[in-house]
Amino acid sequence: MFLLTFILPRYGDEYVYSFVFKTEKRTKNIIDIIYSTYNMYMNWSGRIIPNFLQNLFLLFGKFPYSVVNALIFVTIIKQSLSLLEKYTKKIKISNFDYIILFFLNWFLIPVFTQDYIGLASSVSYSWTLCFLILYMNYLESIFSREKVPNKIIIYSFLIGLTNEVIIIFINIFLLFKILQYKKINYKILLSLWIGSAIEIFSPGNFARKFSPETQRNITTLFERYSQFFKMVHTMIILKILIFLLLLFIIKYYLYEKKKKYIPLDMIITSGITLVLMIIIMPRNEPRAYLAPFYFFILSIFYFLKLLYTDNRYFLYFSKFSMGIMLFISLCNIIPYYFLTVRRLDNERQKMTKYYIENNLKEVVFYENDSILNKMDSSHRAYEMLFLYPEVFTNSYFSKYYGFYKVYAIPRGSKLFIIEFEMGSRLDKIEINLDQGNKNSINSFQIDNMSLLTIPEEVKEIEIKGEGFKIKKIKIIEIYKGITLDINNDIRKIGLN
């Protein structure tokens, strides 16, 4: 975990959190981080604790974050097994159980890289999951007491300041505890509800919900549920969980007539949380579903644990099959991260350094998505730069390094930009490359500007059509910057 975290390049969100939110100032000290967290609370997100920690660890740097993130992951696994021990009273945890729970997470979490490795999303989801599991462990040990320690009240309040999925999950889970113990601790509930209200009703949550960017990306409830159930990992988790639950009931309740603990509290809470999250989210967001998915997986582990504990042949088979699957997976993952991802990141850093040293302000980088997507969706790294320079990732990357504009283009191409006069009709434009012998690779049009990526070897460009007037033409190339800049209505261009 440490090595994967350390090697993974920065994502776009991490450049956003490198600045005091809503300002042009880079975060440099704890005062900047507090002010940035306040700005985010008022303008973007009520997740006070994750927002603060994201800013803080970006200030600390990659190495401290990688160490803490690896420890967080280990804590999640360790405390999850401890939680099961508290619930069942009889289950005995072995060293092999740690491997099994890691194995299940590695293969079943829909977006492992985003949830457990990338800084911004990992702090938002896996770190808050860790806080939740620690809280549930502590809650289980003190809930039946007549008098609870004051620190659980503080802890309950802080849990409310994490994120929406944790808030929904723990509130539903507490209802199960109340029904189980037939007692209500109003101090715990009140402190949790106060923290939850501060998070949920933050001005930033409402500002984000009604922002133009969010409104553009909203999908219908039907589309969100459809996308959710189309995710391969969703169906695999649900099928395995249902199969093992039925097998467990048949074996212990129907055949052996034994009553054993069934984690219905975790399963039902996770299911309700998922239903509510899909309703409130503007679009399908797999990384936000980590907590309920994790407790589904923990339930799967529990069923497997009891089944293979009573069957040594199943235990041997599990060890052998998991070892083979992990070996094959790591044989793909290790070269991908240590060779491909690292090479692409070093290449981009080299380009960035070159552009800065040569004072180039409007520049192009390689768009590497076609290379990065050769890994499965759960473990892949992601491209953060795109053709359109106003995408927030391009915009913050530009601001971070002091560029004017940043574009991303396919390898073997250069960027051709046409800016038209206002009022131009752009529906009848025809662009011929080398007298029609070559085609543009991809294009993007916004307002009165067209962005085209064209092959590097193109020698002649001809712009045909009527009803428009060209204001400016540019060509930008890798390592060269702007190689052509014409401020005339010219229709035919010869290139060297």
What are these model-predicted stretches?
Residues 1-44, 58-76, 84-94, 322-496:
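Intrinsically disordered, polar/acidic, low-complexity terminal segments
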Residues 73-84, 129-143, 171-179, 242-250, ...:
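Transmembrane alpha-helical segments
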Residues 90-100, 148-149, 184-190, 257-269, ...:
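Membrane-interfacial loop-to-transmembrane alpha-helix junctions, especially the N-terminal start
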Residues 95-140, 163, 236-241, 273-303:
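Membrane-interface micro-motifs in multi-pass membrane enzymes
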Residues 149-151, 193, 306-331:
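Signature aromatic-anchored transmembrane alpha helix within multi-pass, membrane-resident enzymes
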Residues 264-274, 294-298, 320-327:
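Hydrophobic membrane-spanning alpha-helices of multi-pass integral membrane proteins
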Residues 5-67, 119, 154-272, 279-288:
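Transmembrane catalytic cores of multi-pass membrane glycosyltransferases
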